[in-house]
Design a protein with these regions (language model features):
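Short S/T/G/P-rich N-terminal loop/turn motif that feeds into the first structured element of a domain
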Residues: 22-114, 119-266
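Bacterial N-terminal signal peptides
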Residues: 7-18
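Positively charged n-region of N-terminal signal peptides that target proteins for export
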Residues: 1-5
């Protein structure tokens, strides 16, 4: 799961600062919204997302519309050429849905806020551009994330999604579980794109490697080979990763930091 994997192959309650976040459902749906700060509005956008958007998300969690809300800040790439400065990831308890004005108004009322839904949208649009929104299906979730973790998001071009998903579940899922158990990582997830979709899209699926710190992203893992052999005693390392290369192409890798999180209590 860390840089070693790249070499062998050639990414809720009130915000939590140190304790682990309750694990979202392993299967289901989530949305990913990409926001770009308007010129000279980076600080204002961060304040808006961590304050007003956080309160709205808390209201949506409290009313049961969503189960988890993540605010991810772009680490690499960043700057004017980066597509997203922030991602907001929302986990749903059932079928996915877009935030309607009625839902927004209900969340505002639930939290006892003084502004209206129209005020909220105007403030958001004054400091940011909503670049895109996508819907994904969660297929596998290993471990859990905490505030301050780093998310390595691996965007995959996958000709045959079923074959690739089956191989990831067979090979990488047990490895990810072992690395979480050994304290080498905080989590891993496997997700397929639902909408938008089609052959012209730049990627069809995403895996996310969750690291506990910046240094852990680049730290060597001398036990990786032994861990692989323990988990897969009947598989050969080289040919196993060669098969990964046949099943998918890593179109892009981005790095984000988990800045804020809300999850429903159980």
């Amino acid at each position: 799961m860390r840089v070693a994997r790249l070499l062998l192959c050639a990414v809720v309650a009130t915000a939590l600062s140190t304790t682990l976040v309750a694990q979202p459902a392993a299967t289901g749906y989530h949305s990913v919204a990409c926001f770009k700060a308007k010129p000279d509005s980076g600080a204002e956008l961060r304040k808006f997302l961590t304050e007003e958007s956080h309160k709205i998300a808390q209201g949506r969690v409290d009313t049961g519309l969503i189960t988890t809300w993540y605010l991810l800040r772009a680490v690499l790439p960043q700057g004017s050429s980066a597509e997203c400065d922030y991602l907001i990831v929302v986990m749903f308890p059932g079928a996915p849905h877009m935030l309607s004005q009625e839902d927004l108004t209900a969340a505002i009322k639930k939290e006892g806020l003084s502004f209206t839904a129209e005020d909220y949208v105007k403030r958001r649009n004054a400091v940011s551009t909503l670049v895109s929104v996508g819907i994904f299906q969660n297929l596998v979730l290993v471990g859990s994330a905490k505030k301050g973790d780093y998310f390595q998001v691996n965007y995959m071009k996958v000709p045959n999604v079923d074959d690739w998903v089956a191989y990831e579940k067979k090979v990488w899922k047990p490895l990810a579980e072992a690395m979480v158990k050994d304290g080498k990582a905080d989590g891993w997830s496997l997700n397929v794109r639902v909408l938008p979709n089609g052959s012209e899209q730049p990627f069809q699926a995403v895996t996310v490697d969750v690291f506990p710190s910046w240094d852990s992203i680049f730290a060597a893992d001398p036990q990786f080979v032994d861990r692989f052999r323990k988990v897969h005693p009947d598989m050969e390392l080289g040919t196993t990763f060669e098969q990964f290369e046949k099943l998918r192409t890593r179109a892009q890798i981005n790095l984000y930091e988990l800045e804020d999180v809300i999850t429903a209590t159980k």
